[in-house]
Design a protein with these regions (language model features):
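Catalytic alpha-helical scaffold of carbohydrate-active enzymes acting on polysaccharides/glycoconjugates
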Residues: 1-159
Length: 159
């Protein structure tokens, strides 16, 4: 026999979620949400928290705002700056993706883009739910079922 659950719709309901753990959550959103005592969820990738891996948005930001195009050419050769460069990176194995992106991080100076493990301490609050968003934010549809499971489980274990 199923138990019935009573739900009240007297107050409007919504869930505030943040994807990927951008650092702006701490600098921009948290003060406002704290002031109004509003709960929220952050979907995190442990590799982003490690500060040694980044995704297409960061790569685009890095290319546009921070580094000399000669650095891109030195690291990746004659790839186009946006989609073509990201497509070049993502067709590689996960390990090679990480190595390529780490090399770019090493030779460039970019602002803090994602939260770090230390930043999570400032989010230690009952209103904040930290949720798994896989370990490395890879395109799951391009992975085998076993690799998908591994990404999900590793993310869960590390968080």
């Amino acid at each position: 026999m199923k138990e019935s659950i009573e739900v009240s719709f007297e107050k409007p309901k919504a869930v505030i979620c943040f994807d990927d753990g951008f650092h702006s959550i701490v600098t921009n959103a948290k003060p406002i949400l704290d002031e109004h005592n509003i709960p929220y969820v952050i979907f995190l990738n442990p590799s982003f928290l490690d500060q040694n891996y980044f995704s297409e948005p960061l790569l685009s930001h890095l290319i546009e705002k921070t580094i000399d195009h000669e650095v891109i050419q030195k690291t990746f050769g004659n790839k186009t700056m946006h989609g073509g460069l990201w497509n070049h990176i993502r067709i590689n194995s996960s390990i090679k993706q990480i190595k390529l992106l780490q090399e770019l991080i090493t030779i460039s100076d970019f602002p803090k883009y994602y939260l770090s493990w230390n930043d999570l301490e400032s989010l230690n609050d009952d209103r904040v739910t930290l949720a798994n968003h896989t370990s490395h934010h890879l395109f799951l549809s391009s992975l085998s079922i076993e690799e998908q499971k591994s990404q999900i489980m590793l993310g869960h274990q590390r968080l």
